[in-house]
Amino acid sequence: MARGSEMKIGERQGAPDDTPIFISSPLTLADIAVPSSPFENRVPDQSDRPRRPLHPETLAIRTQTARGAEREHSTPLFLTSSFVFDDAEQARALFTEEIAGNIYSRYSNPNTDEFVRKMALLEGAEDGIAFASGMAAVFGSMAAYLKSGDHVVASRALFGSTHQLFTKLFPRWGISSSYVDADASADAWAAAVLPTTKVLFVETPSNPGLALIDLEMLGRLAADRRLMLVVDNCFTTPILQQPMKWGAHLVVHSAMKFIDGQGRVLGGVVVGSAELIAELRFFIRHTGPAMSPFNAWVLSKSLETLSVRMDRHCSNALAVATHFEQHAELDFVRYPYLASHRDHALALKQMSAGGGIVVLELKGGLERARRFLDAVELLSHTPNLGDVRSIVTHPTSTTHSKLSEAERVQVGIVPGLIRISVGLEHRSDIIWDIEQALARSA
């Protein structure tokens, strides 16, 4: 694809525009409702009509908790800490897990169940579980399966708190880690695997450098060496990339970013096979990092507009990246769907669009970056991303400040690096603000 050309979300190389971007087997209207679950199919019965696969836009809207006696059209908020038993026998059977049902909102709640069901469907997973935050989800995705003496191989380019988890916290419990560069060969990844290695952990694209990792290659390695592949899919959402298609066992999201899309609530989610999620459910039930029903209700509503928002995020980000790619005040511009990006071919292979993040390096280093941040007028200066509002962040002094200078250099975080989360404003207004901030900070 030529630099600057656009691809609509959902399009694939060689696929018609209306082809569902689902992975695994096609999902149908009947698949929205699972027998003996609280989910129902809110589409009129079509049992006498041909079954057809549903697109993610439809699944994100039509997957809902079963209607109550009031026959509400929109899922209500279930603000309750616990649920009433019909009788003593039901209480016993629920706690022994002989029957399914709600007991306590730390274990399950109709709102969290609906949100998780949607995320699992969008990622092509069997099951999932919601967490109080993205980092709680990252921690749980490994802590539930690792023990003292185990080893993790991770991509070197990681979010700052994830890096701290591997380097500062896990070693306290006897869990060691090794890092591999994102652009390393398959042989280099294989060489990092030890007899004690249990997990491969990556984020792609990486935060903040937008390095991509070949998920198909890692999926083969995980299968060959019987490892669990965990992928942080936060930057792309399941609308743009489905890691389980390439062999991932668990997919992790910080839901407070693009999933929410408006910077309102905290949340995280992990999806995967029913067997792995059962182990994770035991972990969360007895350690407590559960998502609140209110946050789940907000996030489930947010998923209804995710594909529409991601379309605008991506088209705006591509426009911003293209506009500034040759700018005289910048040393580089990184965006996966620019032909100049090192991993452009890989982006076309495993992502259906380039995402909503653009990275710039300003000439003038740290002081220039500070002046730029102080000069923006429209864009928000905050450490979040994935918002409808465009956001600028300086990773060196914020999200990755706990890394040493040498560690930052290793993953390409230089003093002049600015991460821009491109929002849904008119693209000309976003470009104007970046232009005037560059001029004023010169």
Please report, for each region that a protein language model flagged, where it lies by residue:
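Conserved PLP-enzyme active-site core in the AAT-like
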Residues: I32-N41, S47-R51, A60-A66, D127-H327
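A common structural junction motif
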Residues: G288-P289, V376-G386, A437-A442
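N-terminal "arm"/small-domain region of PLP-dependent enzymes with the aminotransferase-like
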Residues: D31-N109, R117
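Conserved N-terminal alpha-helix of the aminotransferase class I/II PLP-enzyme fold
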Residues: D87-A136, S161-L169
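PLP-dependent enzyme catalytic core of the Aspartate aminotransferase-like
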Residues: R3-E6, F22-I23, L27-R42, T167-K168, ...
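Acidic-histidine catalytic/liganding microenvironments
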Residues: L122, F324-A328, V376
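Conserved C-terminal alpha-helix-loop-beta "cap" of PLP-dependent enzymes
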Residues: F332-I418, V422, I430-W432
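Glycine-rich beta-alpha junction loops
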Residues: T65, L79-F85, F235, K257, ...
